[in-house]
Amino acid sequence: MSNESKCPFKHTAGEGTSNRDWWPGQLNLKILHQHSRLSDPMAEGFDYAAEFKTLDLAAVKRDLQALMTDSQPWWPADFGHYGPLFIRMAWHSAGTYRIADGRGGAGGGQQRFAPLNSWPDNVSLDKARRLIWPIKQKYGRKISWADLIILTGNVALESMGFKTFGFAGGRQDVWEPEDNVYWGSETTWLDDQRYSGDRELENPLGAVQMGLIYVNPEGPNGNPDPLAAARDIRETFARMAMDDEETVALIAGGHTFGKTHGAGPATHVGPEPEAAGLEEQGLGWKSSFGTGVGGDAITSGLEVIWTTTPTRWSNDFFDHLFGYEWELTTSPAGAHQWRPKAGAGADSVPDPHDPNKRRTPSMLTTDLSLRFDPAYEAISRRFHEHPEQLAEAFSRAWFKLTHRDMGPRARYLGPEVPAEELIWQDPIPAVNHPLIDAQDIQQLKGQILNSGLSVAQLVSTAWASASTFRGSDKRGGANGARIRLAPQKDWEVNQPQQLAQVLQGLEALQSAFNSAQSTGKRVSLADLIVLGGCAAVELAAKNAGYSISVPFAPGRMDASQEQTDVESFAVLEPVADGFRNYLKPVSGITAEALLVDRAQLLTLTAPQLTVLLGGLRVLGANVGQSPHGVFTSRPGTLSNDFFVNLLDMGTQWKPQSEARDLYEGSDRATGQYKWSGTRVDLLLGSNSQLRALAEVYAAADAGEQFVKDFVAAWDKVMNLDRFDLR
């Protein structure tokens, strides 16, 4: 018998067949419990904004400037300058953002984690992050990875002679991968099952293939057709809020610098970071081609140098794009790319590592799209003739690219925040008057409740205003009162006719109050909308026998229509809001999955989802005053009736449609009709985890806890966009 120690276990905690393996369609509630204190190594109460304000940003930038030309033998800098690599790192960090759900982007520093750290489009960015680690190590908690990655891209541009538009800090790191982001359903890298029909890209995706940031640089599925590629470019850049001019500026500006890497076949490239051996220490894609680095590096498989000035800002990209006629060729790795016809341009661009060698300029298929797509060509020729316009457009587009997911300017930190207010930042006027005090609040609540507006109207309007917030890109929310402006005032989910009535009543109270003030004190409509909801919740709690004060913090302001980009806000319109029992048919997605998605965007936990849904039902907040899910005989009373009646075993539920989107509950003994409910309503009794939570609130002693928990969750939603309070 061997003396070798034998482990009594073949597997360890967390391994084995999971619930999702057994039931692949099971609702994923784990996305509601990400980034908890349990995964955060920072001390409780850590205030990143306060730490960043103590940072010597100029010193960090000096260190980054020095790094740009401090070439390391383990990953030598092309042309002796790391700037182009760092621009790509920052671009790919920010460029995952998409407007449809606001997810992705640079916030949180997700490029450090799977899957992004191992995407095919992010080959070699592991080295870029490792190069800036000594600087991150030096400044520690004063600057996050998320901020440092973007700042490094900015400094890279500045070090190569470009004047940037500005930089804002404020991106706080997270410490685990974000499981709530849908990157696609493909199971193979670079697959594109996300398309249907006439190349219609699935929402909310912004990239053409699994593992890419935007488009395939060789053309759609590797087809080197510049016009077909232009269609993909326009679609994907639009999905991250870029118009044609911004798109051209970003591509041309970014490709003024550096090169791509395709020195040899991809078969030489080792596994990505998440699959690499322990000895690689988080690095991946180790190459066996030659030295594997420098002139032997393989990244995209393309081997392109665009300009004669790869480490200096210039107009050379357009000089070459329009100065040569182009023919198709292949890189040493076999990838499609383009070179000047008839040997033109030979030896006109530098070699990245041998000063005694010269090369021929080259282009990607997607570069040629800027010449052969008519709309892109017109912009490109204008930029070629007016390079100052390119510089201005690129500086603004780069700032937008790297800051789009940060939300309003109130979140921006640091001395380089631009003074100019930009429409895509969803501007809201600064408070310029004294705010209402506690006495005013009580007076206004009384006036609101005596105005003839019902609990249901006040609650649903306040919810409609506040619940547009997205924790992903910090857009939406009650501040600004944009519910009274296009496009929100016309959204079906906001019940335009009822909304107009409520707003008219609140505006009359606002006008009367403001006119009566002699000290300049004012109340905004944004504040009144929320205050009306809070007053209604207090009244509903009183109707249930509980005296509770719903927190309210004044300080919201009213945005104007001129400060509101209608097209930009259109993407915030919900296709579903399970909290109001509203649903537009969405192919392939269940109502319950959409509910959880909405809850995650609202940063709600599963208990908060549960208590809010049950409370909003009995308060009558359903769109169109639908009776579905209103499991109470006393609507307008903040009771736990929803849970009590949902879990009543005396009720038998049956689907009322083939789609199983509506159910009828009848008395199990007599068959008499009792209630109607949607999939979302029945979910809280069907899903084992949500049922466990519903049972807490259905208990005989749960009435007071239910009211307190509802008020706490309500207060959270009403203040999600109040960055001034945190």
UniProtKB/Swiss-Prot annotation:
The lineage of its organism: Bacteria, Pseudomonadati, Pseudomonadota, Gammaproteobacteria, Pseudomonadales. Binds 1 heme b (iron(II)-protoporphyrin IX) group per dimer. GO terms for cellular component: cytosol. This is Catalase-peroxidase. Formation of the three residue Trp-Tyr-Met cross-link is important for the catalase, but not the peroxidase activity of the enzyme. There is a cross-link at Y214-M240 (Tryptophyl-tyrosyl-methioninium (Tyr-Met) (with W-91)). PANTHER family: CATALASE-PEROXIDASE (PTHR30555:SF0), HYDROPEROXIDASE I, BIFUNCTIONAL CATALASE-PEROXIDASE (PTHR30555). NCBIfam families: cat_per_HPI, PRK15061.1. Keywords: Heme, Hydrogen peroxide, Iron, Metal-binding, Oxidoreductase, Peroxidase. The active site is at H92 (proton acceptor). HAMAP family: Catal_peroxid. One of its GO terms (molecular function) is catalase activity. Homodimer or homotetramer. It is an enzyme of class 1 (oxidoreductase). Residues 335-362 are annotated as: Disordered. Bifunctional enzyme with both catalase and broad-spectrum peroxidase activity. The record marks R88 as: Transition state stabilizer. InterPro entries: Catalase_peroxidase, Haem_peroxidase, Haem_peroxidase_sf, Peroxidases_AS, Peroxidases_heam-ligand_BS. Heme b binds at H255. GO terms for biological process: cellular response to hydrogen peroxide; hydrogen peroxide catabolic process. It comes from Pseudomonas fluorescens (strain ATCC BAA-477 / NRRL B-23932 / Pf-5). There is a cross-link at W91-Y214 (Tryptophyl-tyrosyl-methioninium (Trp-Tyr) (with M-240)). Belongs to the peroxidase family. Peroxidase/catalase subfamily. Its EC number is 1.11.1.21.
